Amino acid sequence: MIGLDTNVLARYYVANADAPGKRQSLAAKQLLESGKRLLVSKTVVLELEWVLRGYYKSLPAEVQAVYAHLLSLPNVEVEDRPAVELAVAALAQGFDFADALHHASYRQCTSVATFDTRSFARRAQAAGWKPRVDLLKDSAI
């Protein structure tokens, strides 16, 4: 089995105009489509979303399409696939991918504690996500 780094997946999914980028894209395509057993870690999944969204300015629907394709490849194993699938579904609902992946990774817990005030806790509760998301308050020590 071969573990894939984020840059291999980025080169596979994003067209590059320069000569080195084209060569790397071809090498990535050959590897991913070779039938060899490949592994994508959860951290690479998370970093890929950041690269697609942050660097390449991909829209959420484009990121979802990348993950739908990646998850459909029979020779690619994705670490904690159920968590990744939940996070991709949450992205489709407008949730932040990283927040959703963190939450999905804690599915065996009774709750998730956060200081995140960007409404993640409220939205997760409204969506009925389990485990519940608890917003911690600052405390004076």
Describe the role of every protein-language-model region.
Residues M1-V40, Y55-E62, A127-I141:
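Short, well-structured N-terminal submotif of metal-dependent ribonuclease cores
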Residues L4, L46, F115:
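Active-site flanking residues adjacent to catalytic metal/cofactor-binding acidic residues
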Residues N7, L26, T43, E49, ...:
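Active-site phosphate/pyrophosphate-handling residues
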Residues K29, T43, E47-N75, P82:
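Active-site-proximal, substrate-binding regions of enzyme catalytic domains
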Residues L73-R118:
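Active-site neighborhoods of divalent-metal-dependent phosphate/nucleic-acid chemistry enzymes
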Residues R107-I141:
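Acidic, PIN/NYN-like endoribonuclease modules and their adjacent C-terminal/linker elements
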